[in-house]
Amino acid sequence: MHELSVAQSVLETVLDVARKRGAERVLSVRLRIGEFTLLNPEQLRFCLEVLAEGTPVEGAKFEIEIERGYFKCAECGHRWRPEDESLKDPSLHTAFDLSELTELLDLKCPKCGSRAVKLDGGDACSIESVRLEVPGEQHAQG
């Protein structure tokens, strides 16, 4: 379960932002996770909530937005969405490197048939915003 390690990294970053801004507590954290990261949003939220206990992040609202991903052919430039069902294949969850995903799915470009297929978006996890309670300020954005 890589949700735990991602949650730890997110929490460390959020705590660092809160500390630098002199925040008493964190009110909310908005994350964007790509669907190709194969992160489970519910598991990620659970890990964040458990790890946040006893910190200024405890009680914060975790908003998680899913970024859709696409495939792009390196030969002809065609860009397309995968079938949503193909992303539910349990064997995909063994991919540790996102570049393996195109191989596991045995992808071919639907336009030209090339196997030179790359991910185009949906492969990252980012902190979009952090809402803080800072003494003397009205709900600062981090």
From Swiss-Prot:
Any one GO molecular-function label of the UniProt entry: nickel cation binding
Entries under InterPro entries matching the protein: Hydgase_Ni_incorp_HypA/HybF_CS, HypA/HybF
Residues binding Zn(2+): C73, C76, C109, C112
Keywords: Metal-binding, Nickel, Zinc
Positions contributing to Ni(2+) binding: H2
PROSITE patterns per record: HYPA (PS01249)
Pfam families: HypA
Biological process annotations from GO: protein maturation; protein modification process
Family: Belongs to the HypA/HybF family.
Function: Involved in the maturation of [NiFe] hydrogenases. Required for nickel insertion into the metal center of the hydrogenase.
Protein name in UniProt: Hydrogenase maturation factor HypA
Gene: hypA
